[in-house]
Amino acid sequence: MGVSDPVADMLTKIRNAARAGHEKVDVPSSKLKVEVVKILKTEGYIRNFRKVEEDGSGCIRVFLKYDDNETSVIHGIERISTPGRRVYSGYKTLRRVYNGYGTLIVSTSLGVTTGRHAREQRVGGELICKVW
């Protein structure tokens, strides 16, 4: 039986690997997952990522980032919109995550972007997840 929410599965793998202190984690690849991981890199939550071909199936290798105290830069990562309960928001009602210390990831008509960028571009969309 397949995974019903692949994005939530990816976020859970990243969260668990960060808490366990792993250097990297591999997740199955998709276009949406690659876009989410790009934002995590741009916002400074991960060191890097690489698309890897293993046995004919695509995989994303995510290299996690830690601070000087060997604690993960990702303190929390939470899925908002799920396959059973989609959550949408207009640009006027996009909230800041943890008073601006976190990042909201939104799927808009302009592509996957951060909540801050969506407000600047005046577009709403589906709330994928929040990271802090």
Curated annotation (Swiss-Prot):
BP GO terms, sorted: translation
Coiled-coil region: none
Source organism, top-level taxon: Bacteria
Pfam families: Ribosomal_S8
Any one GO cellular component localisation term in the record: ribonucleoprotein complex
Physiological role: One of the primary rRNA binding proteins, it binds directly to 16S rRNA central domain where it helps coordinate assembly of the platform of the 30S subunit.
Similarity-based family: Belongs to the universal ribosomal protein uS8 family.
NCBIfam families: PRK00136.1
Subunit structure: Part of the 30S ribosomal subunit. Contacts proteins S5 and S12.
Name used for this protein in its record: Small ribosomal subunit protein uS8
UniProt source species: Treponema pallidum (strain Nichols)
